[in-house]
Regions:
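Acidic, metal-coordinating catalytic segment for phosphate/diphosphate chemistry
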Residues: 182
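N-terminal Lys/Arg-rich, disordered targeting/topogenic segments
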Residues: 1-7
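Hydrophobic membrane-insertion alpha-helices, especially the h-region
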Residues: 10-27
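A structural signal for short, hydrophobic/glycine-enriched beta-strand patches
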Residues: 26-174
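Residue-level recognition of hydrophobic positions within alpha-helical transmembrane segments
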Residues: 7, 20, 110, 173-176
Length: 182
């Protein structure tokens, strides 16, 4: 009888844990949704920061800078093995911007280091308000990390949707990022 009660308790506890994890994952997904409907107005921020990673992040950041959403752009987390002219050559449309308004960070290798570099960049360039551009699924963790060093009211977020035709790739990225978020 006691073993049966222990077994029921074990099953109940396991079910409760699964429910809590699913509810928290749903909360994580809702946080991602909040970045989708951000309306960006001209001159809302002084600087734009792109955290490298998935496709489209850099091009989205360059497009925002071109639209005068901010005055300067930091591309953070650039692989140190990639020469910076390779990135410049990838986006010839933005040559003028590369010559005046764009800086690179190739020392950061994770989200915390990116945010630390953003903090230093803000100080060195006398920038108060920034827009951080990253993949939508990455932004909850970016926001969590940035709240340690950056003022909430001076930091805005812009989510770039990962455009994959395969739902399983999107789900894998969401689950991996959720685990990192925990």
């Amino acid at each position: 009888m006691i073993n049966e009660i222990k077994l029921h308790y074990y099953h109940f506890s396991l079910l409760l844990i699964v429910i809590i994890v699913l509810l928290h994952f749903n909360y994580f997904l809702l946080k991602i949704k909040k970045y989708e409907f951000l309306l960006i107005e001209e001159n809302i921020v002084e600087g734009i920061v792109v955290l490298t990673g998935d496709k489209y992040r850099i091009s989205e950041g360059l497009s925002l800078l071109e639209k005068k959403i901010g005055n300067k752009l930091l591309i953070s987390g650039v692989n140190s093995k990639i020469p910076l002219n390779v990135i410049k050559n990838e986006f010839p449309k933005y040559d003028e911007l590369f010559n005046c308004c764009i800086e690179f960070d190739n020392t950061s290798s994770n989200t915390f280091e990116n945010i630390r570099e953003v903090y230093v960049w803000k100080l060195n360039n006398d920038i108060n308000t920034i827009l951080i551009v990253s993949s939508d699924y990455h932004l909850p963790r970016v926001e969590l990390e940035s709240n340690r060093l950056l003022l909430k009211e001076e930091t805005h977020y812009y989510g770039v949707e990962y455009k994959s035709q395969k739902i399983n790739i999107r789900m894998k990225k969401l689950i991996v990022e959720y685990i990192k978020y925990l």
